[in-house]
C-alpha cells in the first residue's frame, strides 16, 4: 500500500523538479536514511528492513528517472552505523550491510 513515506518521497521529487526549474540548477539528495533499528536500539524486523530497501530503491529510481536529469545523486547519511548507534543507519550490530543497501545494486 501507499505509506506516509511514499507521500514524502513523492513530495521530495516534486520539490526537486520545482527547485531545479526555479533556480535553473542541478540538485542532490543528501542525508537520506531508512529505519534500521527498533525502539530498543536493536536491528529492526525483516519487514521494516525490506520496506527501507523499497523506499530507498524508489528514491534512487525517481531521482534518476523523474527529475528531468536534474538530480545528480543520492547520499545515504552514515549507512555504516549500527542500530545501537543510529536509528537510520543500514548495517547490523556486527558491522554487515542490511538488505537496505541492496537498493544501490
Segments (PLM) and residue ranges:
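Aromatic-rich peripheral "rim/lid" segments of glycoside hydrolase catalytic domains that contact
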Residues: 11-14, 18-21, 37-58, 62-105
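Aromatic- and acid-rich polysaccharide-binding/catalytic face
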Residues: 1-17, 21-36
